[in-house]
Amino acid sequence: MRFDKLTTKFQQALADAQSLAARNDHPYIEPVHVLAALLGDPDSGAASLLARAGVAVNRVQPAIDSALKGLPQVQGEDNVQVGRELQSVLVRTDKEAARRGDTYIASELFLLALADDKGDAGRILREAGLQKKALEAAIDAVRGGENVSGAEGESNREALSKYTLDLTERARQGKLDPVIGRDDEIRRTIQILQRRTKNNPVLIGEPGVGKTAIVEGLAQRIVNDEVPETLRGKRVLSLDLAALLAGAKFRGEFEERLKAVLKELAQDDGQNIVFIDELHTMVGAGKAEGAMDAGNMLKPALARGELHCIGATTLDEYRKYIEKDAALERRFQKVLVGEPDVESTIAILRGLQERYELHHGVEITDPAIVAAAELSHRYITDRFLPDKAIDLIDEAGARIRMEIDSKPEVMDRLDRRIIQLKIEREAVKKETDDASMRRLAVIEEELEKLQREYNDYEEIWKAEKAAVQGTQAIKEEIDRVRAEMAELQRKGQFDKLAELQYGKLPELEARLKAADSAEREAGESDSGKPRLLRTQVGAEEIAEVVSRATGIPVAKMMQGERDKLLRMEDFLHKRVVGQDEAVRLVSDAIRRSRAGLADPSRPYGSFLFLGPTGVGKTELTRALADFLFDSEEHMIRIDMSEFMEKHSVARLIGAPPGYVGYEEGGYLTEAVRRKPYSVILLDEVEKAHPDVFNVLLQVLDDGRLTDGQGRTVDFRNTVIVMTSNLGSQHIQSMAGKPYEVIKEVVWDELKHTFRPEFLNRIDEVVVFHGLEAQHIESIARIQLKRLGERLEKQEMRLDVSDAALAEIARSGFDPVFGARPLKRAIQQQIENPVAKLILEGVFGPRDVVPVDWQDGKFVFTRTLQ
């Protein structure tokens, strides 16, 4: 026996047999041990070979187990030896290998030798239906006329079943999603596949446009015989490159596996079409020093037409990997897959609707489908249809399913309250005074009431949940019946098809209708309480998912938000004093956008705020961010004085390729990509270099900007505010004149500084008035209120008299510098003295800090609160 000439698989089987004998205290390794080891290894292929030869494999394993129990056992024997019976079988195996001309002895010849064996192993196989001729035929079929010439000869067998996934089989089983539309691309793919040479289409398109779906659509058409005669009966196999590479430890193993795949494909005489998803991964796959990569190994087969291949890759990766290898590129024919429009996406979603309803066990309404297509197109700009729309449907369905599976919020709230009261009851029980006794009676009464309410809700919830689960089970049964009907139609078994179509299916549909109505009835209790479980995905659920993902308020406005928008001016006036026109113009722009009337291809609003320093230009922008997002954090503030040089424009949008900082992205573009719904403040805009305005033209007109890395950043959900001091001398000199007259003069000044195409794209040029004495007093109140809030954190209260307020306003008023001197006046005249008094211990927690103006100075007299 040539033990050095056993294949790796056979050597492994003998080693496993030795371990099995040692574990069971058997002194000798018998053929039955080796048979058990071969059948126990899922990678050996012995079980599939015996099944192909007509052996009932499920009967073999129990018989082996009982045979092993019948073998003699010797306790404490470590040296396990090869039994005489096994030696005899191995010799016959060696002879059979020599007769067949094999260099290495494969494990299937051991099974062939067992066919003549008189021992347990041979008897077990014969009783399970083994016939020598059938096994020989099965071995010849598996080998495909090849001899075993290497130690890995067995590993590379049936390479297609190991390293590919049969898409046509999955289509036959109904496991692929239906493919709606894409007829032109599928037709073009079929057309290329029918060519004599270079019959290899490559599907090129952006991620998520449906390249893989086109191949799945082709597999479904082949299964349904909706293809030309030349493609009928062919299989579409998806190549699993990861499986090809996994475990290829030694040099040449990967190449051997790929050669085995190519050889099987060549033997099948064009009956298989290989689909390579992410085709660019083939370039460089398995590459080692001096070795060929997968791409180069495929070239000869592709050129000769032996390999029918469909590739799929994105535009960027095609350009980066495939186009660089001209020899590989010319062997493929390009099929460009574009992004479908919103109407096509809606059709695709309607086709997938049933699958997602079945998976999540919820109902997806048509408004939800339309909303998913439209909202994803409008608000999710960095991804592509239909993928991003499908994601919205999927996530909304998952959210509703999660609500169904978990306890409803109203019950959860009651449950927590009941637990809280029970804890309180146990604490009160320990007390003996009258007040505690009365409290205990109140707790008992409330507990009883809450428990009754909870039990009512629980009953409704269980009824609703049972109804939902019943509906789901019927839907799954209908889906299974439809898949069975499709299979029967393909096989032409019309008698059984008619049985299902006119018997079982109508019965199931009637049951579903009854279950649906029962579910609706379960939703309304006797007391008229609303449904506890939502089972429908509507447009609002889709809008909620979009809002959560992007931070953009897409969901339908609640009444509270409507009222808030209508009173927006009041909110802004709390922080900005004396600028009525500016506040009104900004409020109108926000209301237009939230009511859905604004141009969807431009930012919500673009404003140029003009006016002297310290009149509230920046403060209004802060107030706007606070109003929209309840936080000033959503304001992206860019000081344009930092962009005075020509080269600093690159900082806004990111450095071009080849420059330092290319990977970091742009200051403005990255901020908007992270917060697509925000207020952008470009402060002191006239100080920026003129080239900066060229960048802003695209933002103001189309609501988009391309950064240094070629990505399009969406500005359509932003409010852009630019501030400038231009024309401030005219505004101050014309104080008291009508707003329109002042604006006209300032507009003439603007024309000398900014280009017409820039000014023309701004929605509103807002002129801020210089502040007057009465405005300063209101601003002083606002600033002192903020100081009061800071003191309240230290448990102190600020009390400013009218005389003190008037003096602060008087000393802080400067018509040239606006409200900023007021801040300095408060700091010097109030904050500094109060800080000293707090440190000296004059004022402490629970004190009132009074501020008064007496005898030409500020007085702080301590009183208890």
Curated annotation (Swiss-Prot):
Keywords: ATP-binding, Chaperone, Coiled coil, Cytoplasm, Nucleotide-binding, Repeat, Stress response. GO terms for molecular function: ATP binding; ATP hydrolysis activity. Residues 3-145 form the Clp R domain. ATP 1 binds at G205, E206, P207, G208, V209, G210, K211, T212. Residues 771-865 are annotated as: C-terminal. The keyword Transit peptide does not apply. GO terms for cellular component: cytoplasm. Residues 561-770 are annotated as: NBD2. Residues 340-551 are annotated as: Linker. ATP 2 binds at G611, P612, T613, G614, V615, G616, K617, T618. InterPro entries: AAA+_ATPase, ATPase_AAA_core, Chaperonin_ClpB, Clp_ATPase_C, Clp_N_dom_sf, Clp_R_dom, ClpA/B, ClpA/B_CS1. Pfam families: AAA, AAA_2, AAA_lid_9, Clp_N, ClpB_D2-small. Its main location: cytoplasm. Residues 82-145 are annotated as: Repeat 2. Part of a stress-induced multi-chaperone system, it is involved in the recovery of the cell from heat-induced damage, in cooperation with DnaK, DnaJ and GrpE. Acts before DnaK, in the processing of protein aggregates. Protein binding stimulates the ATPase activity; ATP hydrolysis unfolds the denatured protein aggregates, which probably helps expose new hydrophobic binding sites on the surface of ClpB-bound aggregates, contributing to the solubilization and refolding of denatured protein aggregates by DnaK. The Clp repeat (R) domain probably functions as a substrate-discriminating domain, recruiting aggregated proteins to the ClpB hexamer and/or stabilizing bound proteins. The NBD2 domain is responsible for oligomerization, whereas the NBD1 domain stabilizes the hexamer probably in an ATP-dependent manner. The movement of the coiled-coil domain is essential for ClpB ability to rescue proteins from an aggregated state, probably by pulling apart large aggregated proteins, which are bound between the coiled-coils motifs of adjacent ClpB subunits in the functional hexamer. Homohexamer. The oligomerization is ATP-dependent. This is Chaperone protein ClpB. It comes from Bordetella bronchiseptica (strain ATCC BAA-588 / NCTC 13252 / RB50) (Alcaligenes bronchisepticus).
